[in-house]
Design a protein with these regions (language model features):
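Conserved P-loop NTPase-based nucleic-acid remodeling module centered on helicase motor cores
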Residues: 53-159, 213-217, 445-449
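ATP-hydrolysis module of ASCE/P-loop NTPase motor domains
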Residues: 53, 94-101, 119-191, 303, ...
Length: 453
């Protein structure tokens, strides 16, 4: 049982810290679930300010995890009651534990909608559609949409389909629409996000282009590839040193490794391009009669080096061959296609939402967005919590989020809208290395952004 555990000083601090929001990075096997359970128990058993368990919101990302957490908490409370049978507060917690808000984010959103459907004029008889039903509905909506577009035959649509759906097969275009739709609905305001996609391709200068989100992402990914390649060189150099007598190889590899590492440290695209294009590869050293190293070992090292060389040359040709003018031209050409894709995706989003509402269906993404509409209002100054959110804020003394690395931007806004700002009460725990919900567009970088503050 958690009460019998010996806590480390760090775990004890996590369990006991109060009156502030807290983000805990906990690796697998570090006992984070036990720590979370103990924090819950200490909150409800606090001698100075005991909290009823139904005033805590504990959110995790799987039904199994929520069930396990509930069982652990109930067992821990039962043990405290056994030790203190006359404690009326503990006996009350034992009763309340059956109604404790230990839940998945989807279940919490569902409860918000069941209680406040009238706030967004939602039919209370809605039901959650199954995956097969949704796929059929998506296919019907897309088929009708594309049929209308073909009939209207606008120039932008025809050019888009010629590029991405040659012949009579629309499948690639359909998949692009669905993929972009998936990214859009993983954001709090999907239509705003789609509009921003178009704006991202309107740069008139390299300075502006380098600030676009897609360009920043690409630059970071290229830097990562270069860093990994530099690390490969370090391994090659280590092999040379272990073998001995390979100073000529080591000299060539060290020179190349330094150039690649220098390139990986560039912070902007134009610096990255300049440094990558300055990388020069040396010739293979000839083995002298006096050299004692193994030919097999030398071949293994040089084969690895050739792979790294191909990687760098491929990056140079694919990403760094164009000057500023050509890059801006390509961006504008891509922007034309992106604009059409966004238009089609936006049309699909509206039609698909209307089709679901007509059938009184919601999917899991709808649960989150509809709950968000109940809890947060978009204003010219940004998102503003609603009166309903204020009620939840008063209801919950603390909001505990397990597996925080699996949150996306919609879930983040939902939970922050019901958290307190005057008395911060968010407790978040997770491990960015264990993000398992990328397929649902979880954003583990949310964890890193908070962790680095």
């Amino acid at each position: 049982m958690a009460d019998n555990m010996t806590w480390t000083s760090e775990q004890k601090q996590v369990i006991d810290l109060r009156d502030r929001s807290l983000l805990v990075s906990a690796a697998a096997g570090s006992g984070k679930t036990a720590v979370l359970v103990q924090r819950i128990i200490e909150r409800i058993c606090d001698e100075s300010h005991p909290v009823d368990i139904d005033r805590l919101l504990v959110v995790t990302f799987t039904n199994a995890a929520a069930g396990e957490m509930r069982e652990r908490v109930q067992a821990a409370i039962a043990k405290r009651v056994e030790e203190n049978p006359d404690n009326t507060h503990l006996r009350r917690q034992e009763v309340l534990a059956g109604h404790a808000h230990i839940t998945t984010i989807d279940s919490f959103c569902l409860s918000v909608l069941r209680e406040h459907f009238q706030e967004i004029e939602l039919d209370p008889g809605f039901r959650i559609a199954d995956e097969g039903e949704l796929k059929l509905l998506q296919a019907d909506v897309l088929e009708a949409l594309l049929e209308e577009e073909y009939e209207q035959a606008s120039e932008s649509f025809i050019h888009f389909m010629e590029a991405y759906a040659p012949g009579k097969d629309d499948e690639r275009a359909v998949q692009l629409i669905l993929q972009l739709y998936g990214f859009a609905v993983a954001n709090p305001r999907p239509e705003d996000w789609l509009n921003h996609c178009i704006e991202s391709y309107g740069a008139e200068s390299m300075e502006t282009l380098e600030k676009q989100p897609w360009m920043c992402t690409m630059t970071e990914q290229l830097r990562t590839i270069l860093s990994e390649t530099a690390a490969l060189y370090k391994r090659m150099i280590a092999v040379c040193r272990d073998e001995g007598g390979m100073e000529s190889y080591e000299s060539v590899l060290l020179s190349e490794q330094q150039m690649i590492e220098y390139a990986s440290e560039a912070s902007k695209y134009d610096e990255l391009r300049e440094r990558v294009n300055l990388i020069r590869f040396g010739s293979k050293p000839r083995k002298k009669k006096t050299d004692s190293f193994s030919e097999d070992k030398a071949k293994r090292v040089w084969d690895m080096r050739e792979q790294a060389k191909k990687q760098i040359k491929s990056l140079s040709e694919d990403y760094f061959a164009d000057d500023d003018e050509r890059l801006l031209q390509k961006q504008h050409l891509a922007g034309v296609q992106v604009k059409e894709l966004v238009r089609l995706t936006h049309a699909f989003l509206l039609r698909y939402s209307a089709a679901k509402r007509k059938k009184n269906l919601v999917d899991f993404g709808d649960l989150e967005h509809l709950a968000l509409n109940v809890l947060s209002e978009k204003t010219p100054d940004g998102e503003k919590p609603t009166l309903v959110a204020a009620q939840y804020r008063e209801s919950f003394e603390e909001i505990m989020i397990d597996e925080y690395q699996d949150s996306n931007y919609v879930q983040e806004l939902i939970l922050t809208s019901i958290s307190r700002t005057d008395q911060p009460n968010l407790f978040m725990v997770g491990d960015v290395k264990q993000s398992i919900y990328r397929f649902r567009l979880a954003r583990p970088e949310l964890f890193m952004e908070k962790y680095e503050i």
